[in-house]
Amino acid sequence: MALRHKSAQKRHRQSLKRRMLNRSRKSTIKTFTKQAVAAATTGENLAAAQSKAESLIDKAAKGSTLHKNAAARKKSRLAKAINRVKAAQQS
Protein backbone atom coordinates (compact mmCIF):
# COMPACT_ATOMS: atom_id res chain seq x y z
CA MET A 1 0.00 0.00 0.00
CA ALA A 2 1.25 3.42 -0.90
CA LEU A 3 0.38 5.42 2.18
CA ARG A 4 2.25 8.66 1.72
CA HIS A 5 0.83 10.74 4.51
CA LYS A 6 1.51 10.26 8.20
CA SER A 7 -2.15 10.52 9.07
CA ALA A 8 -3.05 7.86 6.49
CA GLN A 9 -0.38 5.56 7.89
CA LYS A 10 -1.66 6.06 11.41
CA ARG A 11 -5.28 5.46 10.41
CA HIS A 12 -4.19 2.27 8.64
CA ARG A 13 -2.40 1.04 11.78
CA GLN A 14 -5.46 1.89 13.86
CA SER A 15 -7.79 0.08 11.47
CA LEU A 16 -5.64 -3.06 11.65
CA LYS A 17 -5.71 -3.00 15.46
CA ARG A 18 -9.46 -2.42 15.48
CA ARG A 19 -9.97 -5.26 12.99
CA MET A 20 -8.08 -7.71 15.19
CA LEU A 21 -10.04 -6.61 18.26
CA ASN A 22 -13.36 -6.96 16.44
CA ARG A 23 -12.45 -10.40 15.09
CA SER A 24 -11.46 -11.52 18.57
CA ARG A 25 -14.71 -10.29 20.10
CA LYS A 26 -16.84 -11.92 17.40
CA SER A 27 -14.97 -15.20 17.81
CA THR A 28 -15.50 -15.09 21.58
CA ILE A 29 -19.21 -14.46 21.06
CA LYS A 30 -19.48 -17.48 18.77
CA THR A 31 -17.62 -19.68 21.26
CA PHE A 32 -19.78 -18.73 24.22
CA THR A 33 -22.97 -19.01 22.15
CA LYS A 34 -22.05 -22.58 21.24
CA GLN A 35 -21.24 -23.31 24.88
CA ALA A 36 -24.65 -21.99 25.95
CA VAL A 37 -26.46 -24.24 23.47
CA ALA A 38 -24.32 -27.18 24.61
CA ALA A 39 -25.17 -26.36 28.23
CA ALA A 40 -28.85 -26.57 27.31
CA THR A 41 -28.36 -30.16 26.16
CA THR A 42 -26.50 -31.19 29.31
CA GLY A 43 -28.58 -29.01 31.62
CA GLU A 44 -25.72 -27.79 33.77
CA ASN A 45 -24.87 -24.10 34.20
CA LEU A 46 -27.38 -23.10 31.53
CA ALA A 47 -28.36 -19.80 33.13
CA ALA A 48 -24.74 -18.77 33.63
CA ALA A 49 -23.74 -19.75 30.09
CA GLN A 50 -26.67 -17.94 28.50
CA SER A 51 -26.06 -14.86 30.66
CA LYS A 52 -22.37 -14.77 29.72
CA ALA A 53 -23.11 -15.08 25.99
CA GLU A 54 -25.75 -12.34 26.10
CA SER A 55 -23.44 -10.11 28.13
CA LEU A 56 -20.68 -10.46 25.54
CA ILE A 57 -23.13 -9.69 22.74
CA ASP A 58 -24.33 -6.56 24.56
CA LYS A 59 -20.77 -5.39 25.18
CA ALA A 60 -19.91 -5.85 21.50
CA ALA A 61 -22.94 -3.78 20.51
CA LYS A 62 -22.06 -1.08 23.02
CA GLY A 63 -18.51 -0.88 21.66
CA SER A 64 -19.71 -0.76 18.03
CA THR A 65 -18.25 -4.14 17.13
CA LEU A 66 -21.82 -5.23 16.35
CA HIS A 67 -24.77 -3.14 15.26
CA LYS A 68 -27.48 -3.01 17.94
CA ASN A 69 -29.98 -4.77 15.68
CA ALA A 70 -27.48 -7.52 14.88
CA ALA A 71 -26.88 -7.96 18.61
CA ALA A 72 -30.61 -8.20 19.27
CA ARG A 73 -30.94 -10.77 16.47
CA LYS A 74 -28.09 -12.88 17.88
CA LYS A 75 -29.61 -12.83 21.37
CA SER A 76 -33.01 -13.79 19.97
CA ARG A 77 -31.58 -16.67 17.96
CA LEU A 78 -29.62 -17.87 20.97
CA ALA A 79 -32.77 -17.92 23.11
CA LYS A 80 -34.68 -19.72 20.34
CA ALA A 81 -31.96 -22.36 20.01
CA ILE A 82 -31.89 -22.95 23.76
CA ASN A 83 -35.69 -23.21 23.93
CA ARG A 84 -35.70 -25.62 20.98
CA VAL A 85 -33.21 -27.89 22.75
CA LYS A 86 -35.20 -27.74 26.00
CA ALA A 87 -38.44 -28.60 24.18
CA ALA A 88 -36.80 -31.54 22.42
CA GLN A 89 -35.57 -32.90 25.74
CA GLN A 90 -39.00 -32.66 27.36
CA SER A 91 -40.81 -34.53 24.61
From Swiss-Prot:
Keyword rRNA-binding: yes
Keywords carried by this UniProt record: Ribonucleoprotein, Ribosomal protein, RNA-binding, rRNA-binding
Superkingdom, taxonomy of origin: Bacteria
Pfam families according to UniProt: Ribosomal_S20p
Family annotation (InterPro entries): Ribosomal_bS20 (IPR002583), Ribosomal_bS20_sf (IPR036510)
Gene Ontology BP annotations: translation
Keyword Calcium: no
GO function terms (MF aspect): small ribosomal subunit rRNA binding; structural constituent of ribosome
Stretches the record annotates as Disordered: 1-26, 67-91
SUPFAM superfamilies associated with the record: Ribosomal protein S20 (SSF46992)
Gene Ontology CC terms: small ribosomal subunit
NCBIfam families (alphabetical): S20
Function: Binds directly to 16S ribosomal RNA.
HAMAP family (alphabetical): Ribosomal_bS20
Similarity comment text for this entry: Belongs to the bacterial ribosomal protein bS20 family.
Record-given protein name: Small ribosomal subunit protein bS20
Organism of provenance: Deinococcus deserti (strain DSM 17065 / CIP 109153 / LMG 22923 / VCD115)
Gene behind the chain: rpsT
